[in-house]
Amino acid sequence: MVYIVVLIVILLDQMVKLLVMEKMKVSESIPIIKDVFHLTYVQNRGAAFGILPGRRYLFIVITVVVISFLLIYYYKTRGSGMVTLSTGLIIGGALGNLIDRIRFGYVVDYLDFRIWPVFNLADSSVVIGAALLILYLWQQEKVGD
């Protein structure tokens, strides 16, 4: 089941990124809701928020390690729908950005809320998955008390 979540995230992420790359120029910004939400094509050569630019291979290694730990965790705790969903979202998002790093040397970002650095669907998937996993772990801790 986790692989279905991973596959859906990767497919959606890569399809949107392909459209952005085909239809927009780098740094082009299209207002969807003026001064609130734009589609802005950014080539992010760093990590989140563009930090540590040019560390492509470091990010590839970190991503592979994190995915490995998540898969181990998933297989040890299999059975919970929340674990399946959360790990699937994190792994799918991580793989979506990993594909970009390997293919292009950068990650394609495009969601621009004007008050936050530009990000993408894969980033959103990782954040939502991490939040769900933290919530699950917190609930498990409360049940164990």
Swiss-Prot record:
Keyword Glycoprotein part of the UniProt annotation: no
Top-rank taxon: Bacteria
Keyword list, A-Z: Aspartyl protease, Cell inner membrane, Cell membrane, Hydrolase, Membrane, Protease, Transmembrane, Transmembrane helix
Location within or outside the cell: Cell inner membrane
Signal peptide per UniProt: none
Listed EC numbers: 3.4.23.36
GO biological process: proteolysis
TM regions (residue ranges): 1-21, 57-77, 79-99, 115-135
Main subcellular localisation: membrane
GO CC aspect terms: plasma membrane
Catalytic function, reaction form: Release of signal peptides from bacterial membrane prolipoproteins. Hydrolyzes -Xaa-Yaa-Zaa-|-(S,diacylglyceryl)Cys-, in which Xaa is hydrophobic (preferably Leu), and Yaa (Ala or Ser) and Zaa (Gly or Ala) have small, neutral side chains
Active-site residues per Swiss-Prot or TrEMBL entry: 109, 123
Membrane topology (UniProt): Multi-pass membrane protein
Coiled-coil residues: none
Pathway the protein contributes to: Protein modification; lipoprotein biosynthesis (signal peptide cleavage)
Molecular function in Gene Ontology: aspartic-type endopeptidase activity
Described purpose of this protein according to its UniProt entry: This protein specifically catalyzes the removal of signal peptides from prolipoproteins.
Entry's family note: Belongs to the peptidase A8 family.
Record-given protein name: Lipoprotein signal peptidase
